[in-house]
Amino acid sequence: MIHIAWLGKKSPFCGNVSYGNTITKKLKGRGYKVSFIHFDNPTNKDFSPSHFLGNNPEVSLPYLIKSQVYTIPSPRAERDLRESLALLKPDVVHASLTLSPLDFRLPEICKELNVPLVATFHPAFDSKLRNLTASTQQVTYQLYAPALANYGKVIVFSSSQKQLLQKLGIDENKLVIIPNGVDQNIWKPLASFSNKHNLIKKKIGQARVFLYMGRIVSEKNIETLLKAWKQVKKNKL
């Protein structure tokens, strides 16, 4: 059984939390052992021998500040991370970036422990540079590129991301594109109309309804989405 140490987020809720929960659930369902390491208020049991003997142990790292965007770890967090990985002895470490300044220390830690290191790098990305926020996103990529070059593999979601990271000096062979996907077992048309569905139709009418769930930011390409919806209406598809 392959043992994966997954460094990710449990809170506060954001896309990174959803990504980590979804992927680790699928991995466990396929028989992989997953140890989830994240920032939280650790308890004494986190480093007890019995805790690390579980099938899917969870380890908490101490922090000073935690937000949806970034976490500032406590001074002892790096030591706790190193010790937990040494005790867990995973076959591979996966980091769902960006998390914290420890992202930059992971390559050295994993090299010392002789364990492969993989990252999913998915900070917000807008290649069109239409505003200050998009420019700030570019700075994030520039800041992380030297560290990512020391990871074994880096998963990105698009060819645009891959091309940018290549320009920033990361070997093409280290970059792997795995596009975002949709779980068709969850997101699918209703098999039958429910009372709730009928109530909604009663309120808004029988016209076709498009629903967007997400942040109102440029990298979500909402303008393109709206144009596509208008085209659907125009062509009566």
Map each language-model feature to its residues.
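Conserved donor-binding/catalytic core segment of Leloir-type glycosyltransferases
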Residues: A5, I155, I204-K230
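An aromatic- and histidine-rich active-site surface loop
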Residues: V92-V115, A119-D126
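Nucleotide-sugar donor phosphate/pyrophosphate-binding loop at the beta->alpha transition
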Residues: P116-V118, F125-N150, S192
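A short helix/loop element that forms part of the nucleotide-sugar donor recognition site in Leloir-type
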Residues: K188-I204
